Regions:
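A short, solvent-exposed beta-edge/loop patch
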Residues: 155-190
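Short Gly/Thr-rich strand-loop-strand
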Residues: 129-159, 205-207
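Bacterial N-terminal signal peptides that target proteins for export
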Residues: 1-8
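Boundary at the C-terminal end of the N-terminal hydrophobic targeting segment
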Residues: 18-19, 23-25, 49
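Early exported N-terminus immediately downstream of N-terminal targeting peptides
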Residues: 28, 32-127
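Small-residue-enriched, tightly packed secondary-structure blocks
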Residues: 105, 148-151, 178-179
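Bacterial N-terminal signal peptides
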Residues: 9-18
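C-terminal partner/receptor-binding element of secreted or periplasmic proteins
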Residues: 184-207
Length: 207
């Protein structure tokens, strides 16, 4: 999964929101979190049904679940897991400002989900992409970018004054990646997320 590209796109969202004073959120439907969760579970079941075997690795901690199986990687972190991430950030991030950024960023997040399905069969990837695209159709498209022909679309619900953004979904069908931040984030912090992405990622490993 090309995480760097996705986080760069997220930083671009911050720049976009900073320049906009109004939002079209009122005429857009909200992201259907339940449907997206259901689609990911369907993807896992279909990957198992394909019979493509790969070494299964899993890690389950309070509020954190990481599963790698059938050429599919799923990371699901709930509210309790977010608390552990904050603790990990405190240990691994030495710069005080970066630490404040990381903790403030995750303050409003209720769930973080990362799905990497780029190694699944082409048929399965395309089917999942169609389902996700239909689910996101009509939601607020905050940013769409292309790099070397590969598209990244970012959806969410912005407040009318553009200061907050809820339920961010980063969808990169060509890369086989789906990242969801369920909850509400201060839009001003999004660019800082991109800048601190590597340090925040390291905090998860230190849990």
């Amino acid at each position: 999964m090309k995480m760097k590209k996705l986080f760069v796109a997220l930083m671009a969202v911050a720049m976009l929101l900073a320049s906009e004073c109004t939002s079209n959120a009122g005429i857009r439907k909200s992201v259907n979190k339940s449907r997206i969760n259901a689609l990911v579970e369907e993807l896992r079941q279909e990957a198992r049904a394909e019979g493509i075997k790969s070494e299964r690795e899993s890690l389950t901690l309070p509020g954190i679940k990481l599963v790698s199986e059938n050429n599919l990687d799923v990371v699901s972190i709930g509210s309790l897991g977010i608390s552990f991430i904050k603790l990990g950030a405190k240990k691994s991030i030495e710069d005080a400002e970066d630490l404040r950024t990381a903790r403030a960023l995750f303050k409003g997040i209720k769930k973080l989900m990362i799905v990497s399905y780029d190694e699944c069969s082409q048929e399965l990837r395309e089917r999942f992409n169609r389902k996700v695209a239909r689910t996101l159709n009509g939601c607020e498209l905050i940013l769409e970018a292309k790099d070397e022909g590969e598209a990244v679309s970012i959806y969410g619900t912005t407040s009318r004054d553009g200061s907050r953004i809820s339920d961010i979904v980063m969808f990169a069908p060509d890369d086989g990646a789906l990242i969801c931040f369920f909850g509400t984030i201060d839009a001003a912090r999004l660019g800082e997320l991109a800048a601190s992405a590597g340090k925040i990622e390291g905090s998860v490993k230190d849990i």
